[in-house]
């Protein structure tokens, strides 16, 4: 367990921790010389069944970013106030930050009790309670590092604090120091936000590389594992020259998504805010600049809780519920705290009623299952996105989906309402197509996707179409998808003509035939033959690859299977390969390949073609 100590410079934080633990948290020569904490200092108190870790955060405002690096993933804080000086400038700053980060408990410790009297101390405590409502029910301890007053009572209270660390979620660790140790190699230090890590585990650096854990020091003791809420030093199997890392990077169990530069948040205003203003954003050991924009009005008063968007100048690795500190553009003023509701928020339609209700409900949701249900109301989302946003393992995601009757297909997650909505869009689009083109048999799968649900996951919509074909809501005739009740057919004269046309295609040995050539061969007017061959195309017997040039549909499908086989074996297929396999001229081969591109079966890549949707021409 980690406990943060904060307060004004020279109010005795470091001395208090030395009295509690026997360890001085000043670790830089400059700190010892100046008598103030500049970077994060650490002390440890071994107990019977655990080790308490204390982070001594710097009190001087110049070192605020260092202070904020120590607050991520911690549930308890001690506010240090000197009895002889009371609430000072940095005390107020730290109080605001502690309130914004919403610690489970803030313990107020009055130090230097030997320098004043009990009446003055009681007056100070009452002033704090009166001025800071969130500390009225806090526990107060009166101490002196010089005389030992109150130290044992405080130590006993801290030893009995409940463990609140979330060890069940994936491991997530913010790096605040990186250095090399002779004989050991790369070492990082930081705080574990969540999860568990063990020696020899392979985890991700936030830049994407996988790294093995060689050794662990948890709470300043060699250990086989580290858990959430602990201060950890990790010896990594990584060369800093080959795998650069720095303060602000992360070590992660889940493969990270790309960092985000646009987020939706709920803020608690510390000062009156305008609709839009530049801000400095602090998260874990990271710091960047950006723009804060209110979503629910032109301004916000102090203590207002409201929805907002933050556009980051440098992207951050954020997840739902992460806490941010926002300071003014000149960094002089703490203006708000923020809780992340959504990463990669949309660029348009940010203030619609539906959108604001969605964000408000996210803020009110009590668990991941409820938030996932909200996210999946109208869209499918990848499992990887949900696992990252909610910081869940794959099994935890499956459990959350099951609680909401949601479904996971390959990497996509969706709910039954989404399936119903999209399948109805498919049926509606196909019905409109039949009304407007009643002489056409149907459409290809790729075209149906574009007609009905463009901008939805293509492989997922194809899956829905396949299910609709299986259960009879759709039918497929010679590759063309249509509604079951939609029919077109030849009359008696056309049936006879089809026999003659089919005979000509058999003579052509798999070649395409032009309308005029077929008309000449059968001594029929070209316009009549054109209308007939296009009707045969609508019935699915023939397929035009360019205007007036047709293949037998079954032959075209055979060629598609051949090309699919080549592309799957080699990863690509060229015009020359197809020309040689089919014994075509180059012009016909190019027309065939371009037709397959248009149908969504292939996609041109340089001088080759690769499979786009290998199932388009499956019968």
Curated annotation (Swiss-Prot):
This is Selenocysteine-specific elongation factor. InterPro entries: EF-Tu_GTPase, EFTu-like_2, Elong_fac_SelB-wing-hlx_typ-2, P-loop_NTPase, SelB_WH_3rd, SelB_WHD4, Small_GTP-bd, T_Tr_GTP-bd_dom. The keyword Protein biosynthesis applies. It holds the Pfam family GTP_EFTU_D2. Coiled coil: none annotated. Residues 35-39 are annotated as: G2. GTP binds at residues 7-14, 56-60, 111-114. GO terms for biological process: selenocysteine incorporation; selenocysteine metabolic process. Residues 1-169 form the tr-type G domain. Residues 144-146 are annotated as: G5. One of its GO terms (cellular component) is cytoplasm. Residues 111-114 are annotated as: G4. Residues 56-59 are annotated as: G3. It is found in: Cytoplasm.
């Amino acid at each position: 367990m980690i406990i943060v100590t904060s307060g004004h410079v020279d109010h005795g934080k470091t001395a208090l921790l030395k009295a509690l633990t026997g360890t001085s948290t000043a670790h830089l020569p400059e700190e010892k010389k100046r008598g103030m904490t500049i970077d994060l200092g650490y002390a440890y108190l071994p107990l019977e069944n655990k080790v308490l870790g204390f982070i001594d955060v710097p009190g001087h405002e110049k070192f605020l970013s260092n202070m904020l690096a120590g607050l991520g993933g911690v549930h308890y804080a001690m506010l240090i106030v000197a009895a002889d000086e009371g609430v000072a400038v940095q005390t107020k700053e730290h109080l605001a930050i502690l309130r914004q980060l919403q610690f489970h408990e803030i313990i107020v410790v009055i130090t230097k009790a030997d320098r004043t009297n009990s009446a003055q101390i009681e007056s100070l405590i009452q002033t704090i309670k009166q001025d800071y409502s969130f500390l009225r029910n806090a526990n107060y301890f009166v101490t002196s590092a010089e005389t030992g007053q109150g130290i044992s009572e405080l130590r006993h209270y801290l030893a009995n604090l409940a463990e609140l660390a979330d060890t069940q979620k994936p491991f997530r660790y913010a790096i605040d120091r990186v250095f090399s140790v002779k004989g050991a190699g790369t070492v990082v230090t930081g705080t574990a936000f969540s999860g568990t890590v063990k020696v020899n585990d392979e985890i991700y650096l936030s830049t994407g590389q996988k790294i093995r854990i060689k050794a662990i020091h948890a709470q300043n003791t060699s250990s086989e594992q580290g858990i959430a809420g602990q201060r950890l030093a990790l010896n990594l199997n990584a060369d800093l020259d080959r795998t650069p890392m720095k303060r602000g990077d992360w070590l992660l169990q889940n493969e990270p998504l790309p960092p985000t530069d646009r987020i939706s948040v709920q803020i608690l205003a510390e000062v009156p805010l305008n609709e839009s203003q530049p801000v400095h954003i602090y998260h874990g050991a990271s710091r960047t600049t950006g723009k804060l924009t209110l979503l629910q009005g032109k301004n916000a008063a102090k203590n207002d809780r409201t929805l907002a968007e933050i556009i980051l100048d440098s992207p951050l690795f954020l997840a739902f519920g992460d806490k941010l500190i926002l300071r003014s553009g000149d960094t002089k003023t703490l203006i708000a705290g923020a809780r992340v509701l959504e990463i990669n928020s949309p660029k348009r339609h940010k203030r619609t009623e539906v959108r604001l209700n969605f964000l408000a409900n996210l803020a009110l949701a009590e668990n991941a299952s409820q938030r996932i249900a909200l996210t999946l109301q109208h869209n499918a989302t990848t499992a990887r996105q949900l696992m990252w946003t909610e910081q869940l393992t794959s099994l935890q995601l499956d459990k959350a989906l099951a609680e909401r009757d949601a479904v996971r297909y390959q990497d996509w997650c969706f709910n039954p309402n989404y399936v119903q909505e999209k399948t109805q869009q498919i049926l509606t689009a196909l019905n409109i197509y039949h009304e407007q083109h009643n002489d056409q048999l149907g459409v290809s799968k790729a075209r149906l996707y574009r007609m009905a649900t463009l901008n939805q996951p293509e492989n997922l919509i194809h899956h829905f179409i396949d299910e609709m074909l299986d259960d009879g809501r759709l039918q497929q005739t010679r590759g063309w998808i249509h509604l079951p009740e939609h029919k077109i057919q030849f009359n008696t004269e056309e049936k006879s003509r089809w026999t003659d046309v089919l005979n000509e295609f058999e003579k052509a040995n798999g070649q395409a035939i032009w309308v005029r050539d077929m008309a000449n061969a059968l001594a029929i007017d070209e316009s009549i033959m054109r209308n007939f061959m296009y009707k045969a195309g609508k019935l699915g017997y023939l397929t035009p690859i360019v205007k007036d040039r047709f293949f037998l549909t079954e032959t075209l499908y055979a060629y598609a299977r051949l090309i699919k086989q080549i592309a799957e074996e080699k990863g690509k297929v060229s015009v020359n390969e197809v020309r040689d396999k089919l014994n075509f001229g180059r012009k016909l081969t190019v027309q065939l390949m371009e037709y397959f591109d248009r149908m969504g079966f292939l996609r041109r890549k340089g001088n080759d073609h690769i499979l786009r949707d290998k199932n388009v021409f499956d019968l």
